[in-house]
């Protein structure tokens, strides 16, 4: 046996899988790798599909971690939530890098298969919508997009009516004794969050006495990390779209780059950003 074969077939490596589960079976690779179905004959459509499918897989993990973190905070278990939220930030940094790959798609290449998408658009990503809901940016009107699939619509409806990460963070402030206005605590959580002076005052106190409120301080910084990464993702999204299609209308009917620029102004945790100025 050649030396390189000895390395590859090291004694103890399993080779008989007649009655054992394989790597491919565990990951269901046959199903996963057969889901890249091009609707055109253009070579670069495969890139477009893989980038978006990979992003959806990462978003699935983000939701998994965000939902677990929300439950952990609700149960007053903040330190475990920190690990989950830190992982979310790492995933976000990974997704941002995917724009570098998609940016290798030129306008001349994309135009060859863009019509194959019809009205399909990333705007319709239900997982991205659920991430926004989990972070507190609630948009009830967006549910109409998902009426075609009753089961999916029900999931999004549930997410819309579920307390967000920022909702439970504010509850953590209340449990620590901070006087949060009743209008904040009794607000309609299906609507976008609006900043409040009592919430801002609480966070200012947290940042002014880090040692006393260490866990709340750590929570606040984890939230800032997530929004920071999300805004970087949004910016790269906008610039990549501009690079590929310029200022054309999006396939989903939006104004394209103009819409994506407006989205950059959406803020999830306004008081945590205000604190930077007020300290």
Curated annotation (Swiss-Prot):
EC number: 1.13.11.11
Catalytic activity entry: L-tryptophan + O2 = N-formyl-L-kynurenine
Cofactor binding note: Binds 1 heme group per subunit.
Family: Belongs to the tryptophan 2,3-dioxygenase family.
Cofactor annotation: heme
GO molecular function annotations of the record: heme binding; metal ion binding; tryptophan 2,3-dioxygenase activity
Binding site for heme: 237
Free-text function comment from the UniProt entry: Heme-dependent dioxygenase that catalyzes the oxidative cleavage of the L-tryptophan (L-Trp) pyrrole ring and converts L-tryptophan to N-formyl-L-kynurenine. Catalyzes the oxidative cleavage of the indole moiety.
One GO biological process term: L-tryptophan catabolic process to acetyl-CoA
Keywords: Dioxygenase, Heme, Iron, Metal-binding, Oxidoreductase, Tryptophan catabolism
HAMAP family: T23O (MF_01972)
InterPro entries in the record: Trp/Indoleamine_2_3_dOase-like (IPR037217), Trp_2-3-dOase_bac (IPR017485), Trp_2_3_dOase (IPR004981)
Residues that coordinate or bind substrate: 48-52, 110, 114, 251
Protein name: Tryptophan 2,3-dioxygenase
Subunit relationships: Homotetramer.
Highest taxon, organism lineage: Bacteria
SUPFAM superfamilies from the UniProt entry: Indolic compounds 2,3-dioxygenase-like
Pathway: Amino-acid degradation; L-tryptophan degradation via kynurenine pathway; L-kynurenine from L-tryptophan: step 1/2
Keyword presence, Oxidoreductase: yes
């Amino acid at each position: 046996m050649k030396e390189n074969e000895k390395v590859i077939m090291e004694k103890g490596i399993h080779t008989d899988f007649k009655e054992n589960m394989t790597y491919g079976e565990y990951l269901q690779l046959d199903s996963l790798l057969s889901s890249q179905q091009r609707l055109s004959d253009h070579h670069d459509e495969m890139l477009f599909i893989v980038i978006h499918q990979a992003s959806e897989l990462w978003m699935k993990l983000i939701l998994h971690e965000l939902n677990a973190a929300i439950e952990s905070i609700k149960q007053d278990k903040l330190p475990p939530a920190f690990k989950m939220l830190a992982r979310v930030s790492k995933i976000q940094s990974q997704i941002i890098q995917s724009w570098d790959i998609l940016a290798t798609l030129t306008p001349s290449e994309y135009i060859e298969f863009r019509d194959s998408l019809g009205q399909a658009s990333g705007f319709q990503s239900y997982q991205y919508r659920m991430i926004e809901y989990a972070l507190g940016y609630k948009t009830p009107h967006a549910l109409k997009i998902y009426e075609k699939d009753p089961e999916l619509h029900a999931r999004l409806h549930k997410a819309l009516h579920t307390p967000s990460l920022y909702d439970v963070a504010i509850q953590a402030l209340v449990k620590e004794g901070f006087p949060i206005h009743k209008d904040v605590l009794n607000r309609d959580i299906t609507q976008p969050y609006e900043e409040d002076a009592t919430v801002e005052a609480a966070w200012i106190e947290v940042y002014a006495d880090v040692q006393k409120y260490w866990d709340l301080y750590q929570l606040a910084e984890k939230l800032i990390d997530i929004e920071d990464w999300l805004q970087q993702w949004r910016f790269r999204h906008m610039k990549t779209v501009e690079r590929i299609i310029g200022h054309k209308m999006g396939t989903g009917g939006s104004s394209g780059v103009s819409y994506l620029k407006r989205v950059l102004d959406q803020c999830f945790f306004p008081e945590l950003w205000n604190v930077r100025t007020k300290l």
